[in-house]
Amino acid sequence: MWIRSRETMKKVLQKYWAWAFVVIPLLLQAIFFYVPMFQGAFYSFTNWTGLTYNYKFVGLNNFKLLFMDPKFMNAIGFTAIITIAMVVGEIALGIFIARVLNSKIKGQTFFRSWFFFPAVLSGLTVALIFKQVFNYGLPAIGNALHIEFLQTSLLGTKWGAIFAAVFVLLWQGVAMPIIIFLAGLQSIPTEITEAARIDGATSKQVFWNIELPYLLPSVSIVFILALKGGLTAFDQVFAMTGGGPNNATTSLGLLVYNYAFKNNQFGYANAIAVILFFLIVVISIIQLRVSKKFEI
Protein backbone atom coordinates (compact mmCIF):
# COMPACT_ATOMS: atom_id res chain seq x y z
CA MET A 1 0.00 0.00 0.00
CA TRP A 2 2.80 2.38 0.94
CA ILE A 3 4.71 1.53 -2.24
CA ARG A 4 1.62 2.15 -4.37
CA SER A 5 0.98 5.56 -2.78
CA ARG A 6 4.62 6.46 -3.28
CA GLU A 7 4.42 5.56 -6.96
CA THR A 8 1.22 7.60 -7.30
CA MET A 9 2.90 10.60 -5.67
CA LYS A 10 5.87 10.23 -8.00
CA LYS A 11 3.59 10.24 -11.05
CA VAL A 12 1.78 13.34 -9.78
CA LEU A 13 5.09 15.15 -9.22
CA GLN A 14 6.35 14.18 -12.68
CA LYS A 15 3.12 15.40 -14.22
CA TYR A 16 2.94 18.77 -12.48
CA TRP A 17 6.60 19.51 -11.75
CA ALA A 18 7.16 21.06 -15.17
CA TRP A 19 4.17 23.35 -14.66
CA ALA A 20 5.84 24.84 -11.60
CA PHE A 21 8.70 26.11 -13.80
CA VAL A 22 6.15 27.81 -16.05
CA VAL A 23 3.67 29.14 -13.49
CA ILE A 24 6.20 30.64 -11.05
CA PRO A 25 8.00 32.86 -13.65
CA LEU A 26 4.64 33.91 -15.11
CA LEU A 27 3.40 34.81 -11.64
CA LEU A 28 6.53 36.84 -10.89
CA GLN A 29 6.27 38.59 -14.26
CA ALA A 30 2.64 39.45 -13.57
CA ILE A 31 3.46 40.85 -10.11
CA PHE A 32 6.57 42.83 -11.03
CA PHE A 33 5.77 43.83 -14.63
CA TYR A 34 2.11 43.69 -15.65
CA VAL A 35 0.62 44.97 -12.37
CA PRO A 36 2.94 48.06 -12.26
CA MET A 37 2.34 48.62 -15.98
CA PHE A 38 -1.44 48.74 -15.57
CA GLN A 39 -1.07 50.82 -12.41
CA GLY A 40 1.05 53.31 -14.34
CA ALA A 41 -1.55 53.46 -17.11
CA PHE A 42 -4.27 54.10 -14.52
CA TYR A 43 -2.30 56.82 -12.71
CA SER A 44 -1.73 58.63 -16.02
CA PHE A 45 -5.38 59.70 -15.78
CA THR A 46 -4.91 61.13 -12.28
CA ASN A 47 -3.03 63.94 -10.53
CA TRP A 48 -1.25 61.53 -8.18
CA THR A 49 1.83 63.06 -6.52
CA GLY A 50 3.40 59.78 -5.43
CA LEU A 51 3.63 61.00 -1.84
CA THR A 52 0.20 59.94 -0.55
CA TYR A 53 -2.61 57.56 -1.44
CA ASN A 54 -4.83 60.50 -2.35
CA TYR A 55 -5.36 61.41 -5.98
CA LYS A 56 -8.01 62.93 -8.21
CA PHE A 57 -9.16 61.52 -11.55
CA VAL A 58 -8.44 64.15 -14.24
CA GLY A 59 -9.26 62.16 -17.38
CA LEU A 60 -7.25 63.16 -20.45
CA ASN A 61 -6.06 66.42 -18.94
CA ASN A 62 -2.47 65.17 -18.48
CA PHE A 63 -2.28 64.21 -22.14
CA LYS A 64 -3.70 67.57 -23.24
CA LEU A 65 -1.13 69.43 -21.14
CA LEU A 66 1.69 67.35 -22.61
CA PHE A 67 1.32 68.76 -26.10
CA MET A 68 1.42 72.31 -24.73
CA ASP A 69 4.51 71.58 -22.64
CA PRO A 70 7.71 72.99 -24.26
CA LYS A 71 9.83 70.59 -22.19
CA PHE A 72 7.94 67.61 -23.62
CA MET A 73 8.26 68.86 -27.21
CA ASN A 74 11.97 69.51 -26.66
CA ALA A 75 12.39 65.99 -25.24
CA ILE A 76 10.54 64.56 -28.26
CA GLY A 77 13.00 66.30 -30.59
CA PHE A 78 16.12 65.13 -28.76
CA THR A 79 14.76 61.59 -28.37
CA ALA A 80 13.97 61.48 -32.10
CA ILE A 81 17.55 62.51 -32.92
CA ILE A 82 19.20 59.85 -30.74
CA THR A 83 16.70 57.17 -31.80
CA ILE A 84 17.26 57.74 -35.52
CA ALA A 85 21.02 57.88 -34.95
CA MET A 86 20.98 54.64 -32.96
CA VAL A 87 18.75 52.74 -35.40
CA VAL A 88 20.70 53.80 -38.50
CA GLY A 89 24.10 53.65 -36.79
CA GLU A 90 23.66 50.27 -35.10
CA ILE A 91 22.35 48.62 -38.27
CA ALA A 92 24.90 50.18 -40.65
CA LEU A 93 27.95 49.92 -38.37
CA GLY A 94 26.84 46.55 -37.01
CA ILE A 95 26.62 44.99 -40.48
CA PHE A 96 29.88 46.60 -41.64
CA ILE A 97 31.92 45.49 -38.62
CA ALA A 98 30.29 42.04 -38.60
CA ARG A 99 31.27 41.54 -42.26
CA VAL A 100 34.85 42.54 -41.46
CA LEU A 101 34.97 40.15 -38.49
CA ASN A 102 33.41 37.39 -40.60
CA SER A 103 36.20 37.64 -43.15
CA LYS A 104 39.46 35.78 -42.71
CA ILE A 105 41.54 38.26 -40.74
CA LYS A 106 44.28 37.70 -38.18
CA GLY A 107 43.29 38.04 -34.54
CA GLN A 108 39.63 37.36 -35.29
CA THR A 109 38.86 36.14 -31.76
CA PHE A 110 40.57 39.17 -30.18
CA PHE A 111 38.65 41.67 -32.31
CA ARG A 112 35.33 39.94 -31.62
CA SER A 113 35.95 40.20 -27.87
CA TRP A 114 37.17 43.80 -28.26
CA PHE A 115 34.05 44.97 -30.09
CA PHE A 116 31.75 43.15 -27.65
CA PHE A 117 33.50 44.62 -24.60
CA PRO A 118 31.29 47.79 -24.35
CA ALA A 119 28.18 45.60 -24.00
CA VAL A 120 29.35 44.20 -20.64
CA LEU A 121 29.88 47.67 -19.13
CA SER A 122 27.06 49.46 -17.34
CA GLY A 123 25.70 52.55 -19.06
CA LEU A 124 26.44 54.62 -15.96
CA THR A 125 30.12 53.60 -15.95
CA VAL A 126 30.51 54.39 -19.65
CA ALA A 127 28.83 57.78 -19.24
CA LEU A 128 31.02 58.80 -16.29
CA ILE A 129 34.20 57.81 -18.16
CA PHE A 130 33.23 59.77 -21.27
CA LYS A 131 32.14 62.72 -19.14
CA GLN A 132 35.73 63.03 -17.93
CA VAL A 133 37.00 62.61 -21.51
CA PHE A 134 34.75 65.37 -22.87
CA ASN A 135 35.27 67.74 -19.92
CA TYR A 136 39.03 67.33 -19.40
CA GLY A 137 40.64 64.96 -21.90
CA LEU A 138 39.60 66.53 -25.19
CA PRO A 139 40.11 70.16 -23.99
CA ALA A 140 43.65 69.23 -22.88
CA ILE A 141 44.37 67.76 -26.33
CA GLY A 142 42.77 70.79 -28.00
CA ASN A 143 44.93 73.22 -26.01
CA ALA A 144 48.09 71.20 -26.67
CA LEU A 145 47.46 70.99 -30.42
CA HIS A 146 45.84 74.45 -30.70
CA ILE A 147 42.60 72.99 -32.07
CA GLU A 148 40.08 75.70 -31.22
CA PHE A 149 36.80 73.73 -31.22
CA LEU A 150 38.29 71.14 -28.84
CA GLN A 151 39.57 73.67 -26.31
CA THR A 152 36.21 73.84 -24.51
CA SER A 153 34.05 70.97 -23.29
CA LEU A 154 31.63 69.56 -25.85
CA LEU A 155 29.09 69.18 -23.06
CA GLY A 156 28.91 72.96 -22.65
CA THR A 157 27.18 73.61 -25.98
CA LYS A 158 23.83 72.38 -27.28
CA TRP A 159 24.98 70.52 -30.39
CA GLY A 160 28.22 69.42 -28.76
CA ALA A 161 26.26 67.78 -25.94
CA ILE A 162 23.86 66.17 -28.42
CA PHE A 163 26.80 64.81 -30.44
CA ALA A 164 28.46 63.51 -27.27
CA ALA A 165 25.26 61.77 -26.14
CA VAL A 166 24.74 60.15 -29.56
CA PHE A 167 28.38 59.05 -29.72
CA VAL A 168 28.33 57.40 -26.28
CA LEU A 169 24.98 55.67 -26.85
CA LEU A 170 26.14 54.39 -30.24
CA TRP A 171 29.58 53.33 -28.98
CA GLN A 172 28.02 51.09 -26.38
CA GLY A 173 24.89 50.16 -28.31
CA VAL A 174 26.61 48.80 -31.43
CA ALA A 175 28.32 45.95 -29.55
CA MET A 176 25.32 43.62 -29.38
CA PRO A 177 24.21 44.20 -33.03
CA ILE A 178 27.71 43.18 -34.18
CA ILE A 179 27.27 39.78 -32.50
CA ILE A 180 23.73 39.40 -33.86
CA PHE A 181 24.77 40.22 -37.43
CA LEU A 182 27.86 38.03 -37.14
CA ALA A 183 25.66 35.09 -36.14
CA GLY A 184 23.36 35.88 -39.07
CA LEU A 185 26.26 35.95 -41.56
CA GLN A 186 27.59 32.64 -40.27
CA SER A 187 24.16 31.03 -40.74
CA ILE A 188 24.22 31.71 -44.50
CA PRO A 189 25.02 28.48 -46.42
CA THR A 190 28.52 28.82 -47.85
CA GLU A 191 27.43 26.92 -50.97
CA ILE A 192 25.21 29.83 -52.01
CA THR A 193 27.88 32.52 -51.68
CA GLU A 194 30.54 30.32 -53.31
CA ALA A 195 28.23 29.55 -56.25
CA ALA A 196 27.51 33.26 -56.68
CA ARG A 197 31.23 34.10 -56.74
CA ILE A 198 31.92 31.31 -59.24
CA ASP A 199 29.22 32.82 -61.46
CA GLY A 200 31.10 36.12 -61.35
CA ALA A 201 29.18 38.02 -58.67
CA THR A 202 31.10 40.87 -57.04
CA SER A 203 31.33 41.36 -53.29
CA LYS A 204 28.73 44.14 -53.53
CA GLN A 205 26.32 41.90 -55.46
CA VAL A 206 26.79 39.06 -52.96
CA PHE A 207 25.95 41.43 -50.12
CA TRP A 208 22.84 43.02 -51.64
CA ASN A 209 21.38 39.87 -53.22
CA ILE A 210 22.39 37.13 -50.77
CA GLU A 211 23.69 38.36 -47.43
CA LEU A 212 21.26 41.22 -46.80
CA PRO A 213 18.07 39.17 -47.45
CA TYR A 214 19.36 36.53 -45.03
CA LEU A 215 20.16 39.24 -42.48
CA LEU A 216 16.69 40.82 -42.50
CA PRO A 217 15.48 38.85 -39.43
CA SER A 218 18.60 40.09 -37.62
CA VAL A 219 17.92 43.62 -38.87
CA SER A 220 14.42 43.40 -37.38
CA ILE A 221 15.83 42.37 -33.99
CA VAL A 222 18.47 45.11 -34.01
CA PHE A 223 15.90 47.68 -35.15
CA ILE A 224 13.63 46.94 -32.18
CA LEU A 225 16.55 46.89 -29.71
CA ALA A 226 17.93 50.18 -31.07
CA LEU A 227 14.46 51.73 -31.13
CA LYS A 228 13.87 50.75 -27.52
CA GLY A 229 17.36 51.93 -26.53
CA GLY A 230 16.87 55.33 -28.17
CA LEU A 231 13.34 56.00 -26.94
CA THR A 232 14.11 54.93 -23.37
CA ALA A 233 17.64 56.40 -23.11
CA PHE A 234 18.21 57.52 -19.55
CA ASP A 235 21.27 56.44 -17.56
CA GLN A 236 23.98 57.59 -19.98
CA VAL A 237 22.27 60.95 -20.59
CA PHE A 238 21.50 61.44 -16.88
CA ALA A 239 25.08 60.73 -15.78
CA MET A 240 26.85 62.61 -18.57
CA THR A 241 24.80 65.77 -19.19
CA GLY A 242 21.92 65.70 -16.70
CA GLY A 243 19.72 66.94 -19.55
CA GLY A 244 21.75 70.12 -20.10
CA PRO A 245 22.74 72.55 -21.31
CA ASN A 246 19.35 74.28 -21.06
CA ASN A 247 17.42 70.97 -21.44
CA ALA A 248 19.05 70.33 -24.83
CA THR A 249 19.74 66.67 -23.99
CA THR A 250 16.63 65.87 -21.94
CA SER A 251 15.30 62.57 -23.27
CA LEU A 252 11.76 61.31 -22.70
CA GLY A 253 13.07 58.86 -20.10
CA LEU A 254 14.87 61.65 -18.25
CA LEU A 255 11.79 63.88 -18.48
CA VAL A 256 9.69 61.14 -16.86
CA TYR A 257 12.26 60.95 -14.05
CA ASN A 258 12.33 64.73 -13.56
CA TYR A 259 8.56 65.11 -13.37
CA ALA A 260 8.10 62.07 -11.13
CA PHE A 261 10.98 62.29 -8.67
CA LYS A 262 11.87 65.99 -8.73
CA ASN A 263 8.45 67.61 -9.20
CA ASN A 264 6.34 64.85 -7.59
CA GLN A 265 4.02 64.80 -10.62
CA PHE A 266 3.72 61.03 -10.94
CA GLY A 267 0.41 61.17 -12.80
CA TYR A 268 1.86 63.51 -15.42
CA ALA A 269 5.05 61.44 -15.67
CA ASN A 270 2.99 58.28 -16.21
CA ALA A 271 1.18 60.00 -19.08
CA ILE A 272 4.56 60.55 -20.79
CA ALA A 273 5.47 56.90 -20.15
CA VAL A 274 2.17 55.72 -21.70
CA ILE A 275 2.82 57.73 -24.87
CA LEU A 276 6.36 56.36 -24.99
CA PHE A 277 5.04 52.80 -24.64
CA PHE A 278 2.60 53.17 -27.53
CA LEU A 279 5.28 54.81 -29.70
CA ILE A 280 7.53 51.77 -29.28
CA VAL A 281 4.70 49.28 -29.90
CA VAL A 282 3.34 50.99 -33.03
CA ILE A 283 6.74 51.54 -34.68
CA SER A 284 7.84 47.97 -33.86
CA ILE A 285 4.68 46.45 -35.38
CA ILE A 286 5.05 48.52 -38.57
CA GLN A 287 8.71 47.56 -38.90
CA LEU A 288 8.05 43.84 -38.38
CA ARG A 289 5.29 43.79 -40.99
CA VAL A 290 7.42 45.65 -43.54
CA SER A 291 10.51 43.47 -42.98
CA LYS A 292 8.54 40.21 -43.34
CA LYS A 293 7.77 41.10 -46.96
CA PHE A 294 11.47 41.02 -47.83
CA GLU A 295 12.66 38.07 -45.73
CA ILE A 296 13.81 34.86 -47.39
Predicted regions located by residue number:
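Short, Lys/Arg-rich, polar N-terminal cytosolic tail immediately upstream
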Residues: 1-13
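A structural signal for multi-pass alpha-helical bundles of membrane permease subunits
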Residues: 10-296
